[in-house]
Amino acid sequence: MKSAYKGYEAYSYLEKGKDISSIEMCKGDKRVKEYLIELDDIQEAKVKSIVDEKIFISLHEHPVLFPEHLERDIFEYNREGKQRCAYEALSRGYYDAIFDNLMDGVCTITSNSGWKWDDILIDLGMRLCDLAHQDFVIKCEKVEDIYRAKSEGKVALIPTLEGAAPIENELDRIDILYGFGIRLMGITYSESNALGSGLKEEKDGGLTNFGKKAVERMNKIGMAIDCSHVGVQTTLDVIEYS
């Protein structure tokens, strides 16, 4: 367990049933069975030396707890917009930094379709408010924060968005997201938007004119670009215009 973790649970400063729902969360050790690879003493020592010396970063995580009764409570849980960060689980892993992709397509606070500008700001704001009430997971804004997390036995959390649909046709929303802490954003999330074509589409039209401007802006302010759910031609265009 990482040394800086002191037992904090998400939103524990709020009163259950009044300020936050009392939905029962599933314990991490119940949701997923343990997957153990047996190591001999030499291998164990090697792993420990790597963990001690190197920085471990995950570029894609959703480090949250889900309801014990998933089918019954998931809709209410998502509507609330307060997904519970799994602090204890993070303390038991080797990650020094994680890219938190937040609620993504299940960010259905006000709309069943997801990906609404107001909703993603609520999601991000709630997560950052919770982070501000503890000191184990730190909001990562620069590379130095990752090194600090490593040295202090903490985890650096980088907020990200897997799709740019919420910015609609507003270029300055990229700057706003950066100001709130977003350091990585996808061009599309499988479906096309104002920037380009997603993987689901039968035809890939590449980056739109607005998409080219968005790529330029992201490069200017230092926001990394995710092409995981982006069409092939659109991805090639992102590379060309970066």
Regions found by a protein language model. Name each.
Residues K46, N169-R183, K200-S242:
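Histidine/acidic residue-rich metal-binding segments in metalloenzymes
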